């Protein structure tokens, strides 16, 4: 766990220092007064390594014991800066305080500083709440202070605040995805979401009876095999001075555990299916960060929370359900459950809020992992402009997206003989595409929509 502290031109007697040089490792030698190591020796070694991102000096017999020199060159994107910060913080073990010194502070490098420290924070994340036995000297819960020596307190305080707001949302998502399924069932997930109300988010929860009353039968069908009841939750952020009249909508698949239902998954690696709620986790983390940052945008986050279990009352292959949209769905495979809960969620949000766009995030298909592995998420969309924006942002943040086709000719693969639509392409092939084609049928309006299949990226 990291914390940034700004101390005006003060250098503590720490064993560890991070020293930000200027371009090509050039630096002001007067800034090295905290050590008696040879300036010429350092300068010579750094010059030979001027193309590196950072360089580590270890001094076992003097203080400080370690100095990491950072090369303030221009970098291509935010992720590269974050990666450097993560690597640097990983070089320092068992430190309680780390001094951060600048040869020359450059406010034009705010983006570099921000992403460097953001990467450091993200690197130090760990999930160990259920561990009671630790290795010797394994101080993973200890707080580490990064002590920034600077006169520009306001400048670095803003960076610190922005980082804390982002990290708070990211770590909430990581915690939710990491929780074991016997702890994070749908009710427990709802309890975590309700805690966000104190940030100014408006949380509305539909329970089983409410969903049954309004006809969310596609969602309810998935949940009927589990003793843990399902929930449908909307999380609204609407500032008084919002810059958009129509909300931006984000919908997350929240299958808290997926056995496959009656169409049971293989036992091997089934434990990983606790992550089948990752899309919902992303949406909840996003909404927390938006609230902390006092976003000017009107945003609605939606999560559909269920367990997919093979109980005595479980949905059967061959069942037909009437969705919230009124369309009937023949359930040929109960392990294609994510699209069923998203069908009700998408139609409800489109009908009730008429949003500016809808983006759904779901660990939807194994087929996307076959296609893209763990490097790209699949992108499916009815709108070129929305797709382009998502792809561009993904490149900057290293959350890479690859766009797949949508075409009406795929629809025949999902047509049912006895219902309006079936939930799988029974003949096989184009698994991720036909899943997206299925979802597209549950847009009520011509709303710009993007489906992100994150099955290969979320865990």
Each predicted region: which residue ranges?
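Short amphipathic alpha-helical segment within the helicase RecA-like ATPase core
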Residues: 1-254
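A generic structural signal for tightly packed, nonpolar segments enriched in small/aliphatic residues
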Residues: 1-2, 62-63, 173, 190-459
């Amino acid at each position: 766990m990291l914390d940034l502290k700004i101390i005006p031109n003060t250098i503590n007697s720490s064993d560890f220092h991070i020293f930000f040089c200027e371009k090509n490792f050039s630096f002001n030698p007067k800034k090295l007064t905290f050590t008696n190591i040879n300036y010429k020796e350092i300068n010579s070694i750094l010059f030979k390594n001027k193309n590196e991102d950072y360089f580590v000096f270890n001094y076992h017999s003097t203080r400080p014991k370690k100095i990491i020199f950072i090369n303030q060159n221009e970098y291509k994107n935010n992720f590269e800066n974050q990666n450097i910060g993560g690597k640097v913080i990983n070089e320092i073990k068992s430190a309680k305080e780390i001094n951060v010194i600048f040869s020359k502070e450059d406010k034009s490098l705010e983006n570099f500083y921000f992403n460097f420290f953001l990467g450091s924070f993200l690197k130090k994340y760990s999930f160990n709440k259920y561990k009671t036995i630790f290795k010797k000297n394994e101080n993973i819960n200890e707080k580490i202070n990064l002590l920034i020596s600077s006169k520009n307190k306001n400048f670095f305080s803003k960076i610190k605040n922005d980082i804390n707001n982002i990290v708070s949302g990211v770590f909430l998502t990581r915690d939710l995805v990491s929780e074991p399924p016997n702890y994070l069932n749908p009710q427990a997930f709802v309890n975590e979401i309700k805690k966000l109300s104190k940030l100014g988010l408006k949380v509305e929860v539909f329970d089983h009876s409410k969903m049954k009353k309004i006809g969310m039968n596609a969602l309810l069908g998935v949940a009927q095999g589990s003793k843990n009841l399902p929930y449908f939750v909307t999380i609204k952020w609407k500032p008084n001075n919002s810059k958009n009249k129509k909300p931006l909508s984000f919908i997350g698949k929240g299958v808290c555990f997926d056995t496959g239902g009656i169409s049971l998954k293989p036992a091997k690696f089934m434990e990983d299916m606790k992550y089948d709620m990752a899309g919902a986790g992303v949406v909840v983390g996003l909404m927390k960060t938006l609230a902390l940052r006092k976003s000017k945008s009107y945003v609605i986050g939606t999560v559909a929370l269920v367990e997919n279990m093979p109980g005595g009352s479980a949905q059967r292959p061959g069942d037909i359900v009437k969705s919230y949209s009124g369309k009937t769905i023949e359930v040929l495979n109960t392990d294609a459950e994510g699209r069923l809960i998203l069908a009700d969620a998408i139609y409800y949000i489109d009908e009730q809020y008429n949003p500016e766009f809808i983006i759904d995030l779901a660990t939807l298909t194994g087929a996307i992992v076959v296609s893209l592995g763990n490097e790209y998420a699949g992108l499916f969309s009815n709108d070129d402009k929305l797709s382009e924006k998502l792809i561009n942002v993904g490149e900057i943040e290293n959350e890479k997206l690859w766009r797949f086709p949508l075409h009406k000719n795929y629809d025949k693969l999902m047509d049912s003989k006895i219902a309006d639509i079936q939930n799988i392409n029974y003949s096989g092939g184009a698994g991720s595409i036909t899943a997206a084609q299925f979802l597209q049928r549950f847009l009520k309006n011509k709303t710009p929509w993007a489906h992100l299949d994150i099955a290969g990226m979320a865990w």
